[in-house]
Amino acid sequence: MAAAVLANKVAKLESPKVFVDSAGTSNWHVGQGPNPPSKRTWEKAGYSFDHIASQFNYSRLVAADLVLVMDKDNHMEVSRYVTSEEEERKIYYLREFDTSGPDSLEVPDPYSLPDSAFESVLEMVEKATDGLIEQLLI
């Protein structure tokens, strides 16, 4: 969901040019399309995004300028690939960019929960991606 929201928002920017990629930290859903409730939620909010699940790896860390994680488990898994301070400095919790001062830096995983949980996550993601874009434009 975060990739869908961010990709749609940065597509409207003339500069800087931003490439949005998404990968899971496990191989559970590799090759599959988006989770139906997640896709339904972002489409209802006006976002479009095509996605096939893939797994994060060291090459992606090296290629990225910024790696956004959703929770502590994601952070731990992504950090396993870090071989330098430069690579470590690329990793941020998405909600670090939420200027409303969230109670937690973690975005909960709504998988297997009702649509209302996906809508709550969408709201968190929208706030955080707005803050991220503000930072990109500085």
Regions flagged by a language model, labelled:
Residues 1-138:
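Short polar/charged helix/loop
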